[in-house]
């Protein structure tokens, strides 16, 4: 299974699609489908049928998943390029700034199995 540079709770920047340029928080990662659900992005309207609980029925808005390649981690309000370096105690994600310097963003332990 592919490892992502974004995880639940991160703020991401949308790179492509109808919501290009928007930012939002990652609500969930669907790793088997390579998709993420982002708060306030790719909002769809769903119709709920009439039932005894909802005699009139209703319409609700839900966030639909988007492909992980269409989002990038947002650092200081702009999309950031991250490079992955593997160390002896796990994986580290480095943020490359425009001036050429690198700064440690996150250190992640590898999962077994």
From Swiss-Prot:
Family annotation (SUPFAM superfamilies): Translation proteins SH3-like domain (SSF50104)
Biological process according to GO: translation
Gene Ontology molecular function terms on file: rRNA binding; structural constituent of ribosome
Gene Ontology terms: cellular component: ribonucleoprotein complex; ribosome
Top-level taxon in the UniProt lineage: Bacteria
Gene3D superfamilies associated with the record: 2.30.30.30
Keywords (A to Z) from UniProt: Ribonucleoprotein, Ribosomal protein, RNA-binding, rRNA-binding
Function: One of two assembly initiator proteins, it binds directly to the 5'-end of the 23S rRNA, where it nucleates assembly of the 50S subunit. One of the proteins that surrounds the polypeptide exit tunnel on the outside of the subunit.
Subunit structure: Part of the 50S ribosomal subunit.
Family statement drawn from the similarity comment of this UniProt entry: Belongs to the universal ribosomal protein uL24 family.
Record's protein name: Large ribosomal subunit protein uL24
Phylogenetic placement of the source organism: Bacteria, Pseudomonadati, Chlamydiota, Chlamydiia, Chlamydiales
């Amino acid at each position: 299974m592919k490892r992502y540079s974004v995880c639940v709770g991160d703020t991401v920047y949308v790179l492509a699609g109808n919501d290009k340029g928007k930012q939002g928080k990652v609500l969930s990662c669907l790793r088997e489908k390579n998709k993420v659900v982002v708060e306030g992005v790719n909002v769809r309207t769903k119709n709920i049928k009439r039932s005894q609980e909802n005699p009139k029925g209703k319409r609700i808005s839900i966030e639909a998943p988007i492909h992980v390649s269409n989002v990038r981690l947002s650092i200081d309000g702009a999309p950031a390029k991250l490079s992955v370096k593997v160390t002896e105690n796990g994986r580290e994600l480095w943020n490359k700034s425009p001036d050429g310097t690198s700064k440690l963003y996150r250190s992640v332990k590898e999962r077994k199995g």
